[in-house]
């Protein structure tokens, strides 16, 4: 038995302007090659664009988009007796938010155009409305989990 204690879970810090953890999570996921100031620029421009498009609080749109994309359940590959099964597992809130952010950024990167701030703002607005590529990805994941419900006892 190990004498070592369990590691404490790190809490995400909030960003300097909006004092919001979700914004900081987005910044850390969009970050490439250590260019954090550029990541902040992209996020803040996207938030400004959301403000212009919807004329509502952009942080509530962001929260709504992430809540809409966050999956409740996912599938995990598990090897049982020589064959691999897709086993549905429940997802915690932190992991769900991380997945949602990853899907939102992936969907916005796939959008046509060159300006990432514009693409991200469009994807966030679409996700808040209940459409877009990230929402489709969530529904796909839920369908996979439902289809493989028979393997739920393999956990």
Swiss-Prot record:
Swiss-Prot/TrEMBL keywords: Chloroplast, Plastid, Ribonucleoprotein, Ribosomal protein, RNA-binding, rRNA-binding
Entry's Gene Ontology BP terms: translation
Family affiliation: Belongs to the universal ribosomal protein uS7 family.
Any single GO CC term annotated in Swiss-Prot or TrEMBL for this entry: small ribosomal subunit
Stored SUPFAM superfamilies: Ribosomal protein S7
Organism of this sequence: Asarum canadense
Protein name according to UniProt: Small ribosomal subunit protein uS7c
Entry's transmembrane regions: none
Family annotation (PROSITE patterns): RIBOSOMAL_S7
Lineage: Eukaryota, Viridiplantae, Streptophyta, Embryophyta, Tracheophyta
Subcellular location: Plastid, Chloroplast
Disulfide bond annotation, renumbered to this chain: none
Name of a matching Pfam family: Ribosomal_S7
GO molecular function, one term: structural constituent of ribosome
Protein task: One of the primary rRNA binding proteins, it binds directly to 16S rRNA where it nucleates assembly of the head domain of the 30S subunit.
Quaternary structure and interacting proteins, as annotated: Part of the 30S ribosomal subunit.
């Amino acid at each position: 038995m190990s004498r070592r204690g369990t590691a404490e879970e790190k809490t995400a810090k909030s960003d300097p302007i909006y004092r919001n953890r979700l914004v900081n999570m987005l910044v850390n996921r969009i970050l490439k090659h250590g260019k954090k100031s550029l990541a902040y620029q992209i996020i803040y421009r996207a938030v400004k664009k959301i403000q212009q498009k919807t004329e509502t609080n952009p942080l509530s749109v962001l929260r709504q988009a992430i809540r809409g994309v966050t999956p409740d359940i996912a599938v995990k590959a598990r090897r049982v007796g020589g064959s691999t099964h897709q086993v549905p597992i429940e997802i915690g809130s932190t992991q769900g938010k991380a997945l949602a952010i990853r899907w939102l950024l992936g969907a916005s990167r796939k959008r046509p155009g060159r300006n990432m701030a514009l693409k991200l703002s469009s994807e966030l607005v679409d996700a808040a409305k209940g459409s877009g590529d990230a929402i489709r990805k969530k529904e796909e994941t839920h369908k996979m989990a439902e289809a493989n419900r028979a393997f739920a006892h393999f956990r």
